[in-house]
């Protein structure tokens, strides 16, 4: 039997504990799970691509079957094909997410019908967490403790120290 290989893609700007919960659960189902960090032209960026990749790698250091990859200028399904992915992994917080994700699945399936999509429903405590809300809290200097992995907090502290030293 061939390996089950997953790809969980997103902008992860920043990665949240909601993302981390989906990643932890998905990592148990796949022989290998890729985390694809992408640029989303519909979203205003907070961390640059390299920083997002590094923050994710630090957050995922204890997961030996996970690799963080990027293909900023391509479709996730094209990256999936190039990596031999068998399943796309998607997280759902609410009906709006389902509508968006099922539309995305339709187009991914048209581009490569051999790649299936698996949906993970966010746990109740994770459903309200979004990168957009986290960025809003950061903007107003509010605590994001418990909403993001420590690697995000460390990165923000490092950025604040750098700005104070200018």
Swiss-Prot record:
Pfam families listed in its UniProt record: CTP_transf_like
Pathway note: Cofactor biosynthesis; coenzyme A biosynthesis; CoA from (R)-pantothenate: step 4/5
Gene Ontology CC annotation, any one: cytoplasm
EC number(s) recorded for this UniProt protein: 2.7.7.3
GO biological process, one term: coenzyme A biosynthetic process
Disulfide bonds: none
Keywords, in A-Z order: ATP-binding, Coenzyme A biosynthesis, Cytoplasm, Magnesium, Nucleotide-binding, Nucleotidyltransferase, Transferase
UniProt subcellular location: Cytoplasm
Cofactor: Mg(2+)
Oligomeric and partner information: Homohexamer.
Protein name in the entry: Phosphopantetheine adenylyltransferase
Organism this protein belongs to: Streptococcus uberis (strain ATCC BAA-854 / 0140J)
Gene: coaD
């Amino acid at each position: 039997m061939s390996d089950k290989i997953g790809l969980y893609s997103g902008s992860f700007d920043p990665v949240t504990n909601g993302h981390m919960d989906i990643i932890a659960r998905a990592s148990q189902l796949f022989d290998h799970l890729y985390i694809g960090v992408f640029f989303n032209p519909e979203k205003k960026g907070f961390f640059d691509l390299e920083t997002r990749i590094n923050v994710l790698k630090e957050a995922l250091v204890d997961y030996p079957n996970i690799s963080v990859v990027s293909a900023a200028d391509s479709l996730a399904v094209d990256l999936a094909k190039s990596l031999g992915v068998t399943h796309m992994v998607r997280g759902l917080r609410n009906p709006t997410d389902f509508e968006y994700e099922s539309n995305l699945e339709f187009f991914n399936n048209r581009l490569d019908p051999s790649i299936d999509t698996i949906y993970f429903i966010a746990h109740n405590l994770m459903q309200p967490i979004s990168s957009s809300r986290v960025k809003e809290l950061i903007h107003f200097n509010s605590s994001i403790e418990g909403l993001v992995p420590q690697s995000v907090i460390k990165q923000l502290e490092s950025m604040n120290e750098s700005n104070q030293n200018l």
